[in-house]
Amino acid sequence: KREETGIYEMKNEERRIMQEIQFIVPAALHDEMLRLRNEKQMDFLESLTGMDWGVADEKDAPEKLRGLGVVYHLESTVTGERIALKTAVTDRERPEIPSVSDIWKIADFYEREVFDYYGIVFVGHPDMRRLYLRNDWVGYPMRKDNDPEKDNPLCMTNEETFDTTQEIELNPDGTIKNREMKLFGEEEYVVNIGPQHPATHGVMRFRVSLEGEIIRKIDANCGYIHRGIEKMNESLTYPQTLALTDRLDYLGAHQNRHALCMCIEKAMGIEVSDRVKYIRTIMDELQRIDSHLLFYSALAMDLGALTAFFYGFRDREKILDIFEETCGGRLIMNYNTIGGVQADLHPNFVKRVKEFIPYMRGIIHEYHDIFTGNIIAQSRMKGVGVLSREDAISFGCTGGTGRASGWACDVRKRIPYGVYDKVDFQEIVYTEGDCFARYLVRMDEIMESLKIIEQLIDNIPEGPYQEKMKPIIRVPEGSYYAAVEGSRGEFGVFLESQGDKMPYRLHYRATGLPLVAAIDTICRGAKIADLIAIGGTLDYVVPD
């Protein structure tokens, strides 16, 4: 239905594909967003995507959108309603759009990402810095007219650390004022954790301001492993883009590729066979167990429980062996394809999965005996790193982190895909919001995933494992969105096509970025040792 504002409001059944996103002028953007947040209860900023629609041309049709802009996806956790809108400015020298970081906390990082890639300045943003690229990077690489290699030769020197940022203010006369702000005061004691620290689980750098052992502020730098995948996608055909999704959250390879394939299939009107839906759902749940077992092992190691570390890795190997037999890979599977899967199930697949289910159920109590009930583990996690439900929603912390804070945000329940509407399973929700609750959610989800697989494994229907596709795949012109419940939360895909064999824009709603964005809020007032437990239970994956 349409509101007076001209914004397209999606019904629930349109959750995974939308082709109409209405425009709103930048001057009215902030007031409209505030109205949607307060009156329509749009409290979840699902995605914020930067766009370059090009320079206006006299040959353009009157309705052709041009300029630099942003696409917003909003959802109400109260009513389930969803809204999508976009805005744009034609001034490429000084593109300015009102910030919504005062409405949704995750917009702080999302808008910094757009500024980093497109040079769009968000008026009212308190921390207008680059998010991923070096501070001395020249230009904005996601602009269609930018040549990154020309202005940025290979740099082999260390990046200088800056302690200042820009707060963008709007003056009463409508002009813009850049106010320089200090990230840390001269008297603050700041230490580096990372980028090469085992507890950051990858090349993540936290600059931590301490007062004794108490954390006062954290500045996260998550660009050390930035690879420009979204830029690369613009020069790849649709089948070629699939190879990169497995390499984002490498513990959610099946789920990531499932989302991208589903987005392209829905856009093209392709209906995959029931056999494919069953296979994809089973693989997604095996992937979830695989991820949660590694979560258990890594968290146990972080907190000093070396023996528990080996339990998770021992049993995870059984899943990787199953993956390898059917997919040919253990970590990077490359299994889902547009219209189906790469190959049919191995003859041993059903047998090995059916052997794994009772085995895992029978041994999970050992995990709890050795770690969950351990008084040291409980003292390190209970009451530590509390994230409120309101903050979880405002930061967009989906998955186990959101559900540990009382937010029922499971995509499999909200808008079922695959064959999740045919199985009975419980959405695990805790309300404590601390490290221990985040840990228990994932341990309980292992059992629920086993339950889902058990209901499907003996009922996989016959049928083709791959629909017949044209040699060159072209997606109809339009904008599309699809999402799945990844191991760490909602993994979303926003696709804008102009009818070519390559995507005009392909943006991923990462599961990990909101988790990293929330670390500063969660850790304030905690001890530095608590940062290790908090980071471990948030379960972010850095390349994501």
Predicted regions and their residues:
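Terminal low-complexity/charged segments
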Residues: 1-214, 291, 373-379, 383-384, ...
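Active-site bordering "gate/hinge" segments
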Residues: 135, 168-201, 209-544
